[in-house]
Structures are given as structure tokens and as C-alpha cells.
Amino acid sequence: MTYSDFIAENVAPKEAKRIGVYNSKGNRVGQIPLGSLSFPNAGQKLYSFGAISDVHLSVADSESDFIRALNYLDSSKVAFTCICGDLTNSGNDTQLARYKSLVDANAKTPIYAVAGNHDTYTYNDDIESQISTYAGKPFYYTVTQGNDVFIMLGIKSEGALFTATELQWFYETLEANRNKRCFVFQHCFTGYATTPTCGNANGMYYSYCWSGEGQTQLTVFKSLLAHYKNSVFFHGHSHLKFRLQAACDYANFDDSEGYKSVHIPSISRPRQEDGSDSDTSPDYDDAGSEGFVVDVYANGIHLRGRDFVKGDFLPIASYWVDTTLQTVAAGTYKDSTGTITV
């Protein structure tokens, strides 16, 4: 990693005073001021939460990876942890029951999870009741923490992700909370196939999400995020490691499409491609495990990307995101597709 790999939102840890300079042999040769990487004067932290994704229970070391992450997050005193889908690899009863048993046995703080595309593979027609049974929450729901609202959206398939009812509910929830900070958790990033976007560095991952009639839903979903300026969108799906930012500025965080978008790698099998836009074959690191601890302040959040195996926070995945509230006038959202009843 070099200094040029950072983006404008990257910040040093709150406690950092200087940047160490090392030569190619790993020997420290000096230090420089933090400069633009200085942590802002943000005041006191309000609370923290965990943000992980793509557990894929039944694959490789997924169980031990999941337990390790839960144990660490509990020890770091997060208020709760959000899981951004793909709790299991196939979504069958055995895997979902195992997910529930691991959460029950290891999570000492609340877990708020949503369904990803892999969770729909067995019970597509009945996915809402299956997820409610094993994850202990409705298919889509809200959680409040102080003045903040967490909007949790499950998906029912890889094409059209939502029912009409869920998409309408999403609009109504954003409208009702338009002048509050809203953290939106939904599994799929906002790009179909190999469209380059946050979470799909250089378009190197092929995603089936948003295909077919899902294309219209994608238009609506993006327009909702862009209109309701106080929202921050968290997603997983591609598994791509944090280090891909070295090859693509928008790999992990982006706001160039009019909304704040945050990519969460896989907690159990992150992908470690070299960043080439032609590298679309999976290169899973089954020994790896990455995710976020998110520190919340009055006017911003500190995203702290972590390697759960090495036990380190990663400089390339440390971001300050300004969330100063903006006024959104009531009844001003317009849907060009006619999907949403306003």
C-alpha cells in the first residue's frame, strides 16, 4: 500500500499522531505529518456497531470465521451487529438452523440480519417466513439507535430483489425519517452484471442481482438513496477485499452517484483478485475474514475496516464519512418509473 492508494475519505485512526515511512524492506526510515489523513474534530463517539456480510455457513471455515467475528465485536463493546446477507450458502433448513444456533451461542449483543441471494436458493417462494423463523426478525424492518434509523431490507431473488410491498415500504420509511440519519442494509450493490460501482471494483465481479424486471427496481432504489440525502447504504455480495481500493478508488466507498455507498467484504471467504477488470473468475481466500466496526458520531461515522484473522484494522479501509443532516422537504420524491405511490 502506498500513499496514493488513499481516497479523500480515508483517515488515520483517531489516536494516530504521525505517519510512519518504511522502505521496500519494511524498515522504518522516518515519519511525516498526518496532513489530510488527520481525524476530524468529531466530538464524543455516540456508539459503535459491527457491519459484516457474506457468512456463507457450510463453506470452508465459515463457522469459525463467524464465531471469531462475533466474539471480537462483543469484546469491542458494539451496541449491535448488522449482517448484510448471505447468512448461509444455500438457504436450506440445516444451514439456517445452524446460523441461529451459532448466533444464540456466541452473540452477546443483538444481531440484525437480512437475507442475501444465497439465502433464497432453497425457499424462494417462502423466504420471508424462513428468514423470520431463523433470523428472528421480519424480512424487512427498522431498528432505532438514539436518533438514527437502521433500515434492514431482505431480498427475495437475484432478479427483482423486492416485492412491490417491500419497495413501497422502503420509500415510506425513508420519507417518514427523511430528516434523520438512516443506515440502509441490503445485500446487493447497485450494479448489474459487470457494471463498475462501489462493491464491484473495475466491474470485475459478475452479478445477477437486478436482472430482468430488477432493472426498474434498481432505478427506483438508486433514486430513493439519492433523494433521501441522510441515508448511507451498506452492501456486500461481491466478497472483494478492502485492498482492491489500491486498484480502484470507488472499491469500498463512493458518493459519486449522489448517495453514500459502503462495500462490506466477506466475513468467511473474501475474494483477493488483483484488481484487473478482466479477472472475473473467483479467487476466494478461505483463510481470510474482513468486515467493519463503525463508530458513530453526531455528524459523521468512522468506518474501520478490520482483518479479523490477523486482528488488525486496515489503514486502506479507515474512512470518515460526513453525515451532517440535510433538510429534505416532505413529499418531494418523484419516481420516473411509476413504481412508487407517492
Model-derived features with residue positions:
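Solvent-exposed loop/turn segments at secondary-structure junctions
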Residues: V55-S58, L87-S90, N117-Y121, K156-A160, ...
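Short, intrinsically disordered N-terminal pre-domain segments
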Residues: M1-R18, I301
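Extended active-site neighborhood of metal-dependent phosphoesterases/phosphodiesterases
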Residues: D93-R178, Y205-S211, T216, V220-H227, ...
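Alpha/beta-hydrolase fold active-site loops
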Residues: Y47, A79, Y140, N147-D148, ...
